[in-house]
């Protein structure tokens, strides 16, 4: 049906919306599997372990196999292992991200003065004091961000995401991050393709954000499909340059669209 060896799917806004499956998403994912295509679920949510994501999606009714979930938190951990293997890392973010990094043997510090790397990320308990400490930690340290998502859609309304926290740190320090990880970065695309063991030309990426999901796919040479069940609107799609290869009301329409390919 697909003509693709692999499919990379966003989660929030694509498969799930407001904590519930997008109507038709479970069946669409099952039909993709029937084609034999490798499936990867890639979320820019850095706060959850892939295993936790898998359990949550399974509870919602999705079939998710081991190794089929990638997050911006994991991409960040791999970046730190490659580029800063022994450097103390100060996190401006949530405990879930700290736990994920610690589980991968990253050297975390609570002391802003000891930081060699500062990781900015979503923080739903962000305060002035945390901003102050993050600013102090950035003095002489490398600045990285887990992902650029300024907002996340919840129950039809936007909530501040990692990008908002990173922007606060960047504004206070008057500097941009040296690396922004997660989608749409080149490192994120490489991490995804490594996991599905496919080249970009045989991979389809599906998501609800033009600036992350589809930008990653377009830059890497993947085929792109925009779903309108999350952030992007049809007007956004019409104005996009380059235009998505597919524009769908939701992932439920994907099997039929690919059948005509």
Across the structure, where does each feature detected by a protein language model lie?
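Asp-based, Mg2+/Mn2+-dependent phosphohydrolase catalytic module
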Residues: 1-9, 16-20, 26-27, 31-37, ...
């Amino acid at each position: 049906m697909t003509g693709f060896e692999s499919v990379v799917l966003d989660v929030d806004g694509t498969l799930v919306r407001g904590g519930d499956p997008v109507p038709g998403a479970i069946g669409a994912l099952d039909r993709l599997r029937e084609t034999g295509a490798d499936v990867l679920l890639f979320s820019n949510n850095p706060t959850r372990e892939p295993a936790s994501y898998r359990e949550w999606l399974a509870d919602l009714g999705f079939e998710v196999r081991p190794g089929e979930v990638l997050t911006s938190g994991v991409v960040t951990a791999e970046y730190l292992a490659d580029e800063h293997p022994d450097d103390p890392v100060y996190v401006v973010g949530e405990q879930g991200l700290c736990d994920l990094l610690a589980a991968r043997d990253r050297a975390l510090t609570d002391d802003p003065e000891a930081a060699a790397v500062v990781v900015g990320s979503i923080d739903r308990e962000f305060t002035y004091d945390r901003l102050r400490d993050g600013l102090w930690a950035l003095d002489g340290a490398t600045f990285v961000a887990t992902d650029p998502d300024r907002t996340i859609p919840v129950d039809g309304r936007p909530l501040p995401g990692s990008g908002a926290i990173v922007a606060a740190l960047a504004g206070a320090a008057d500097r941009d991050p040296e690396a922004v990880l997660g989608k749409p970065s080149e490192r994120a695309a490489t991490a995804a393709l490594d996991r599905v063991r496919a080249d970009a030309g045989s991979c389809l990426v599906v998501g609800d954000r033009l600036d992350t999901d589809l930008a990653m796919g377009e830059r890497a040479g993947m085929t792109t499909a925009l779903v309108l069940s999350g952030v992007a609107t049809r007007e956004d799609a019409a104005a996009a340059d380059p235009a998505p290869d597919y524009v769908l009301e939701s992932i439920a329409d994907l099997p039929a669209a690919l059948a005509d390919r």
